[in-house]
C-alpha cells in the first residue's frame, strides 16, 4: 500500500517528471541508467522501506526514462536480491532472526559454550552482510547483461559486457560500505548506507 501511495503521490505532484529529468541528464545510456536507477536507487528504496517498494517505484521510473515495461519490471525485481536481508531498516534480520529464534533455548546452549545471544546475533547479521555483499558484486553486471540480451535493440550479451568495468565499479561502491555497515553498525543500515555511498560516488 505504501509503495503505491508513494508512486501516485510522485506522479500527481510532478515528482516523477522531475526525477526523470534528473536521471536523463546524468546519461542517455540505458545501461548506466539501469545501474543508477534500478540498482543503486532501488537498493536505497529497499533499505529504507522494503516490502517490494523498489519494484513499485523504480520500475515506473525506468518506464518514464523510456525502458520497455517488461524490462523495467525485471530490473526492479532483480534489485530484490542483495539489499533485501537488510531492507525496511533491517526488519528481516531484526524480526526474522531476532524474534524468530527461541532465545531462551539458544541462550542456554550458548552459555554452555561460553557465549551469549548478542555474539551469535552479531555473527549472523555480519555473515549475511559479507555473503550478500560478495554476491552483490556481480548483480549489476547480470542485470545489465539480461537487459541488453532480452530487451536491447541488438539483443546482445556483448553490449552488457561492454559496461562490465562500470557495472563492477558500481557494485563495489555499494558492496564495500554495505558489508562494513553490516559488520560494524548493525542490521539497520547496510542497504541504506551502501546505496547512499554508491549514489554519491557513481
Listing of model-derived features with the role each one plays in the protein:
Residues 1-68, 74:
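Membrane-embedded alpha-helical segments and adjacent helix-loop junctions characteristic
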Amino acid at each position: 500500500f505504501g509503495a503505491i501511495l508513494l508512486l501516485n503521490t510522485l506522479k500527481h505532484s510532478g515528482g516523477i517528471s522531475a526525477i526523470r529529468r534528473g536521471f536523463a541528464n546524468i546519461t542517455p545510456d540505458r545501461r548506466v541508467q539501469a545501474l543508477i536507477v534500478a540498482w543503486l536507487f532501488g537498493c536505497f528504496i529497499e533499505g529504507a522501506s522494503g516490502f517490494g517498494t523498489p519494484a513499485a517505484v523504480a520500475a515506473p521510473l525506468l518506464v518514464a526514462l523510456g525502458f520497455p515495461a517488461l524490462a523495467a519490471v525485471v530490473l526492479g525485481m532483480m534489485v530484490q536480491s542483495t539489499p533485501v536481508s537488510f531492507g525496511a531498516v533491517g526488519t528481516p534480520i531484526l524480526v526474522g532472526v531476532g524474534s524468530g529464534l527461541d532465545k531462551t533455548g539458544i541462550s542456554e546452549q550458548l552459555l554452555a559454550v561460553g557465549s551469549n545471544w548478542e555474539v551469535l546475533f552479531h555473527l549472523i547479521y555480519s555473515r549475511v552482510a559479507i555473503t550478500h555483499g560478495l554476491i552483490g558484486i556481480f548483480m549489476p553486471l547480470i542485470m545489465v547483461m539480461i537487459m541488453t540480451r532480452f530487451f536491447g535493440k541488438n539483443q546482445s550479451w556483448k553490449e552488457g559486457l561492454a559496461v562490465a568495468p562500470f557495472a563492477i565499479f558500481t557494485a563495489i561502491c555499494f558492496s564495500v560500505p554495505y558489508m562494513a555497515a553490516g559488520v560494524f553498525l548493525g542490521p539497520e543500515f547496510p542497504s541504506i548506507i551502501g546505496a547512499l555511498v554508491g549514489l554519491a560516488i557513481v
